Amino acid sequence: MIYSRSRLPSEGEILIATVKQVFDYGSYVTLDEYGGLQAFLPWSEVSSKWVKNIRDVLKENRKVVVKVIRVDRRKGTVDVSLKKVTDDERRKKNLQWKKIQRLDKILELVSQQLKLSEKDAWEQVAWKLEAKYGDPISAIERAVKEGEKILIDAGVPEIWIKPLLEEAAKHTEEKKVKMSGLITVKTSEPLGVQKIKEVISKALENIEQDYESILNVKIYTIGAPRYRVDVVGTNPKDASEALNQIISNLIKIGKEENVDISVVKK
């Protein structure tokens, strides 16, 4: 379980949330980095574009990246926005989330070995490393390569150091795999470039959340009308499935938006 130093998030914070209930007027989500704290996502904050049915955008149990827009510390309530998260913020958060999950797994296993609580692990290891270096998992990876001094300098208690380094060595960054596909994209619509960008953006929604091993996805022109789709991850099967899903999304959404998309090579 992931533990946060604070009971409530701060306004402007970018977080991972799990959609729990979807209503006509909005959705209740839980904030994964705050112990499953419930937050409200208003209908007006779901999309910057007109959406006929909120369930076309939000599906229960799906993870989404949200921005905190209101916090009432007296009542303990939080409101979040989906539409205020930029593509760059979403990409960075998904990468950070994968690191947090890896950190959580390491701390869970080490705390079990020591017969201590996971909260102890977060307080005595993760928070100390965060205070000293900013990114706990990167600090642990450095310690595996450079030695225990990295942990000692951050004030990590001695009891944690040896088992932490041993366990972390088993969870070092996995070898990356890359899957690519070529497509052609054509449209006779006015403002065609903007229309193509919108189709690509929609096609990529939730891909990195749906496939946990996916690290990065890029779609870019290699000379109009040809585009390359690159999927980078740590699991070949997931990377292949994600590539197929993206291309399928592109073709489907392209038809809806009068953008002709065809596969050249996968």
Swiss-Prot record:
Function: eIF-2 functions in the early steps of protein synthesis by forming a ternary complex with GTP and initiator tRNA.
Family that this chain belongs to: Belongs to the eIF-2-alpha family.
UniProt protein name: Translation initiation factor 2 subunit alpha
UniProt cross-references to CDD domains, sorted A to Z: S1_IF2_alpha (cd04452)
InterPro entries tied to this protein: NA-bd_OB-fold (IPR012340), S1_domain (IPR003029), S1_IF2_alpha (IPR044126), TIF2_asu_arc (IPR022964), TIF2_asu_C (IPR024055), TIF2_asu_middle_sf (IPR024054), TIF_2_asu (IPR011488)
Quaternary structure (record): Heterotrimer composed of an alpha, a beta and a gamma chain.
Cited Pfam families: EIF_2_alpha (PF07541), S1 (PF00575)
HAMAP family recorded: eIF_2_alpha (MF_00231)
GO molecular function: ribosome binding; RNA binding; translation initiation factor activity
Alphabetical list of PANTHER family matching this protein: EUKARYOTIC TRANSLATION INITIATION FACTOR 2 SUBUNIT 1
Native organism taxonomy: Archaea, Thermoproteota, Thermoprotei, Sulfolobales, Sulfolobaceae
Domain of life: Archaea
This protein's UniProt keywords: Initiation factor, Protein biosynthesis, RNA-binding
Domain called S1 motif: residue spans: 12-83
SMART domains: S1
